[in-house]
């Protein structure tokens, strides 16, 4: 129920910006990735959780105009966040950066279809987004040698596009509705 396609557009614009800006000095040495630790894991966790709480509120509150659908939006938002967290935890092998970006990947992906999907579809959407983020962030840094410091392209660009596809794919898994006679 978020602004439906803004994540994908923003992510792809960020990808273009990262390509134009180039790599940070010292990021690659002899063609190999040089590890640069995050400046503060506690601040990474705090920022992620502030975003999650705010995102949850934004998603649900933006559905208030849809009448009785806001409960479904709340459940779907939570399910996508759980799916993204679990997938990033498993695929990312307990890496704190992946663990804290996994729920955000799920949230980005569910924005397009939070009012359309069944909660199981939201869980699957979030899980695929979490795994997609881990794979794409790693490939971007290691294989393609593109220095996207925050992972904006994998998080918003790819997970946003995946969310748009999933919102169409999983719409048939809808909840039964009351018939108006």
Predicted regions and their residues:
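Conserved small/polar residues in nucleotide/adenosyl-binding loops
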Residues: 1-3, 171-180
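Interfacial loop-to-helix junctions that mark the boundaries of transmembrane helices
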Residues: 4-5, 34-40, 66-75
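Membrane-interface loop-to-helix entry segments
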Residues: 4-12, 74, 124
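Transmembrane alpha-helical segments of multi-pass membrane transport proteins and ion-pumping complexes
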Residues: 11-19, 23, 48, 52-56, ...
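Alpha-helical transmembrane bundle and helix-membrane interface signal
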Residues: 19-38, 64
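Membrane-interface helix termini and inter-helical loops of multi-pass transporters
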Residues: 60-68, 173
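Structural signature of hydrophobic alpha-helical transmembrane segments
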Residues: 69-80, 121-127
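Cytoplasmic-side transmembrane-helix entry/capping segments in multi-pass membrane proteins
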Residues: 96-104, 151
């Amino acid at each position: 129920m978020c602004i439906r396609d803004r994540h994908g557009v923003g992510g792809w614009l960020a990808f273009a910006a990262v390509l134009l800006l180039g790599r940070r000095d010292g990021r690659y040495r002899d063609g190999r990735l040089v590890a640069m630790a995050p400046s503060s894991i506690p601040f990474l966790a705090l920022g992620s959780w502030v975003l999650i709480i705010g995102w949850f509120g934004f998603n649900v509150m933006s559905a208030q105009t849809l009448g009785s659908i806001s409960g479904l939006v709340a459940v779907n938002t939570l399910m996508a966040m759980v799916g993204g967290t679990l997938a990033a935890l498993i695929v990312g092998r307990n890496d704190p950066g992946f663990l804290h970006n996994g729920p955000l990947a799920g949230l980005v992906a569910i924005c397009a279809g939070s009012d359309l999907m069944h909660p199981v579809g939201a869980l699957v959407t979030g899980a695929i987004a979490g795994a997609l983020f881990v794979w794409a962030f790693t490939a971007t840094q290691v294989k393609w040698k593109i220095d996207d410091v925050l992972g904006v392209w994998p998080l918003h660009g790819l997970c946003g596009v995946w969310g748009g596809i999933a919102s169409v794919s999983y719409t048939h898994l809808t909840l039964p509705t009351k018939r108006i006679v």
